[in-house]
Amino acid sequence: MEQQGTNPPFIVTDGLTKTYIRREKPEHGGITRLWRRETREGQALRDVSFRIGRGELVGLIGPNGAGKSTLVKLMTGILTPTSGSCTVDGRTPWAERKAHVRSLGAVFGQRMQLWWDVPIRDSFDLLRDIYSIDEGRYRRRLDELTAALDLGDIMQSPLRQLSLGQRMRAELCGSLLHEPELLFLDEPTIGLDAVSKLKLREFLRVENETRRTTILLTTHDMEDMRALCSRVMVLGHGQLLYDGTLTNLLHRYDTAHTLTVTYDGAADASKLPQGAVKDGDTWRITLQKDGDLSRTMQQVMAAGKMHEMAIEEQNVDELIARMYREMAL
């Protein structure tokens, strides 16, 4: 692995493994199969070790079933590992869960911690009581977050009346009221428009830099990672496949982009680069990083009068699929 964090360790995992037993119906056996079940052992995580320094903002990526949720549940103390260890600021999450959860914040794109039919200000007051936050500290922090997240005009609105972007900002406020040392974010920008994404990323960047909040971000959005994460960890089949900079990951595995071109009128397909594919009114051309970009552009321009052109990068899933192929997983 390339990187294990340069700051003093805040999160430490060593050989973290989680095995589960799955019960299955036998294919044969007559009436006995009604009460007899075959069992099969599977591994959600296998020998995962890493260090994360206090104040780091780390991206955790991988396809569905890679082990991301299991890892987060172990670090929050929801699950206990089969073997291996994990400490967060010296605490073992599942053994000291009551103390541990007071230092955590979490925002999950598809789940809510605020109350649906209650004005968000009332939800924040309830969270103050749950976390036993001192009144003065609570008011100072709420004022800070209200200004930073632009919540002033919606404080008396129930969550159900808010747009997706407003709900996400409110959820972030709720998760940060008690000033957690560690924040888990799961797809925080999913479904948001471009402006909302930019504002949310900027808030997280400032929160991380000014308060040294350690943030673990799971996302499929490459722009989230580019904007926020200097370090990424890639999970696959329960294993830690990569731990290093996003720049090096892209340099190694992001070997091709797609050029999309639309023309005013019909294009002369015979002049387009070999392998160009027509998709409706758009032509799609694969750009290899080691290819002759200048020649490709000459061919594209010679094929007709261009109306619009854009370059699409590989998304996270495509990047990981390439990694899997190279590792023969």
Regions found by a protein language model. Name each.
Residues 177-181:
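A short, proline-enriched helix->beta-strand linker immediately N-terminal to the Walker B motif
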Residues 84-95, 100-101:
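Conserved ABC transporter NBD signature motif
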Residues 158-162:
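Conserved ABC ATPase signature
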Residues 183-187:
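Catalytic Walker B motif of ABC-type/P-loop ATPase nucleotide-binding domains
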Residues 257-329:
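Short, charged/small-residue-rich alpha-helical element at the C-terminal edge
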Residues 201-287:
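ABC transporter nucleotide-binding domain
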Residues 27-32, 125, 129, 136-154:
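Conserved ABC ATPase "signature" region
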Residues 76:
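Helix-to-loop junction immediately C-terminal to a conserved catalytic motif
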